[in-house]
């Protein structure tokens, strides 16, 4: 919320060339309730000659009152060739063996790829798939060890990425029940086989889709109110385990 309040100071400054002022909020998905409400007040009565750019990877997570005051501009993802070219231009190197993983997880976004690389996103996703492969019975000792690496203020960025990848994995599992072997763009080896085992048909896909929706909402709320990361992530995995046991 302090960052949002600093916008008032920014808007009080004069523009030397008489042009517009631009405020970029990246990423709006992680605004807590207080910050979102503070932003809403500014959006309701925006300063003159001001443009707000709210970057959101999941627009449905934004407050409806914030969304109603915005225009949606969808940006298409870059092709793999253009993505790697852009990363090369800014001297960001991707390990050759992980290029496919990062291009798919990054969804054609240069910024997202940089973030994934910063927090070892490929390894986090592989770990998630490893736990999903244990279902319907998770190894509690291994899981607690894994979850412990996301605790603490210094690991906030890794925690946010873990949540995104957890949501992605459950959503992809639900798609497997509908698309089967036609699920495209396998991110890691044996991924489709794991998802097909968890979600063999459209009826089961409905259960995973419902879990994906609830899970995303709960985790975003947990982040916004600063719930204990360990408890929040363990609870999420146990809910996934419970869902797998009903199949």
Regions found by a protein language model. Name each.
Residues 3, 23, 27, 31, ...:
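Helical "lid/switch" subdomain of P-loop NTPase nucleotide-binding domains
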Residues 9, 41, 64, 68:
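Conserved adenine-binding aromatic site and its adjacent loop/helix in ATP-hydrolyzing domains
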Residues 12-14, 37-53:
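Conserved catalytic/switch belt of AAA+ P-loop NTPases
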Residues 28-31, 40-44, 153, 157:
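Short, surface-exposed loop and linker segments with low hydrophobicity and enrichment for Pro/Ser/Thr
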Residues 1-34, 196:
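Clamp-loader machinery-focused feature within the broader ASCE/P-loop NTPase space
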Residues 48-50, 57-165, 169-247:
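Charged, glycine-rich active-site and insertion segments that engage polyanionic ligands
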Residues 4, 33-37, 160, 230:
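Conserved strand-to-helix beginnings and helix N-cap segments that scaffold or border functional pockets
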